Amino acid sequence: MLGNVLVYCATREEPELAVKELPIAQVGRPYSVRIDVAHASTGVSKLLVAPAKPLPEGLELSHQARDKHGVINGTPLKTGTYDVLVYGSTFGTQCAGQDVEQFYKIKVTN
């Protein structure tokens, strides 16, 4: 039995964020994008934005523990092109939890 668990842990797919590019946002207009975590074998314990690579002012990422998705929503306040890092991890079971991260560029226009 232990051998089967070890084989499964070693061969399971790595989770990844299904959204590869964020759509263009507009100042003063509501914005919402669902970010799914693909290939997660367990629930997602956290999905966050790195403080060093934040979302534009007015946008935030929300996530409920165990959900395999998060949502970026809000209303952007300033134009620009922003580098954003979204990262997270899955819960562990017999196998250790797995990490996921994705760099994005988000453009905010008038």
Predicted regions and their residues:
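Low-complexity "stalk/linker" and mucin-like segments enriched in Ser/Thr/Pro/Ala/Gly
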Residues: 52-70
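Solvent-exposed, low-complexity, repeat-rich "mucin-like" stalks and linkers
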Residues: 1-8, 15-46, 104-109
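Well-ordered beta-strand positions in beta-sheet-rich domains
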Residues: 71, 101-105
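Extracellular/luminal low-complexity segments enriched in Ser/Thr/Pro
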Residues: 71-81
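Beta-strand-rich interaction surfaces with strong enrichment in secreted/lumenal proteins
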Residues: 21-23, 60-62, 73
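An extracellular/luminal cadherin ectodomain-centered signature
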Residues: 13, 45-50, 72-74
